[in-house]
Design a protein with these regions (language model features):
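Catalytic cores of nucleic-acid ligases and guanylyltransferases
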Residues: 1-123
Length: 123
């Protein structure tokens, strides 16, 4: 069974952050990740990764596909960010250029880059 990938919730600008008790259920904050917004669909058999604009990203991140298929216990949809961090542990930085190199027509290059600079998914 394939899940339809829904449209993601997008961040929006505000003039100021409201007080936490001014919003029903409170507030949650996270940093701005320098990556690709992605929706992941796992139906128990196949993994599909789509951009926030519904463009297919699955073929560009084989290491994520393999990890999702191995680690996700049940069918689900995940909303998150694909990033690549480079540098020594403790001083890593997200690398936009390394990430954008993954969108390449040659499968051999995508596979090589997935081994040299593996991506991470932050949900």
């Amino acid at each position: 069974m394939r899940y339809a990938i829904p449209e993601p919730m997008l961040a929006k600008s505000v003039d100021r952050i409201p007080a936490p008790d001014a919003v029903a259920g409170g507030l949650s904050f996270e940093p701005k990740w320098d990556g690709f917004r992605a929706l992941v669909s796992w139906d128990g058999t196949d993994v599909e990764i789509g951009s926030r604009g519904a463009k297919p990203l699955t073929r560009y991140f084989p290491e994520l596909v393999e990890a999702f298929a191995r680690l996700l216990p049940e069918p689900c949809l995940l909303d998150g960010e694909i990033v690549i961090a480079l540098g020594e542990p403790g001083s890593q930085r997200l690398d936009w250029d390394a990430l954008t190199q993954r969108i390449h027509p040659a499968e051999s290059r995508v596979r090589m880059l997935s081994e040299q600079t593996p991506a991470m998914f932050i949900a």
